[in-house]
């Protein structure tokens, strides 16, 4: 018997799911504050650059977890029933409905504290939340 693949035609739900998976993979569901901070950064990037959320959700230059060689890449396939994934999903929904306060003061870039990308070498971060540094 062939598996049945159900196509979700509701693009908003698809984008919500993709963003939730990215937020989960980047934060590993560590805390609500971390999920809110990353969602705030995504919203800021969308609003300040007019980039579409589906494009942001798949941008490997923003999210290290999207790279196949990333240690966090496997987390993109987390079980949707996990409580920490569900927290990320709810946070993304709040962001997409405009119900999330900007906890990163307008930041549009981030990296995790254990990494230092070249673009951040001479930049000053404006917020540190959940092991992530946020920049304008």
Which residues does each PLM region occupy?
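Bacterial extracytoplasmic/cell-wall-associated proteins, especially those involved in peptidoglycan
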Residues: 2-136
